[in-house]
């Protein structure tokens, strides 16, 4: 099956869209989480566009100010223990003298991490990171692989994999067995993905560089080749990651969101058609835009009656959620989207994220 994907012509066109959700430790040189400290050099009224504020006040209502206060504050640093090379108890023993670790409820291998003497330390310089014992990964970014729940021996596709935080997490849950196809459209990002897979000891995978239409062609030419599970961590506007990258506000524009929504609908449809009967797909983004989230999922449900949107139980995950957006402007949104997991930065003091779990009914 790995050979089947390898024979396709490699697509050289690089993606112009980067996902902030997978970027490694890019926080400021301060551990101060206050909004005021972060905006010393960039006044808030200069940073935030009026049309951005108008749009989000309409979307969030009275929660807008809370959203902005969290979005303009620093994000807590996190690590995920890589069970392919180490274990939680071993990492605790190695780090506990210098670091304070706070468990992340929804991921048993995840921890918020702070330096005990209060000084800043780049987590990417830790020996445990270089050895692949840990992965520096934002807490909300750990949710999609947990919801996907890949099993050992399965055939799994990560459609937008680079640079690899979720991909290596999937491989860990698969216990390095089965087949993991890790795809991205960017050559430079694929190099980073390959390095992270090697560092983390992943050896059940193949790397592919294909745009989504190539997967569509594979599905048409090889109808018997299907995946047990697929993760579509789609390129998005990243408005849930403002606290990691303030430029997200400056880059925001409605036309770009509409364009991204079209790309996302194409990705989710192609991925759904690559699923085995009773297979599971997780669609996720690091934006809180309903046009990129609930509307994309609704598009799939409208087109495919055998697409079932499964409920993601926040109580089992130990996570707080914001109710799904069921009505916004002229978007066509199905009532079933209440089963999706919508997380705003102020819910759990993380990035904003959206996660949907979809099953292909037989």
Regions found by a protein language model. Give the residues of each.
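S-adenosylmethionine
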Residues: 1-362
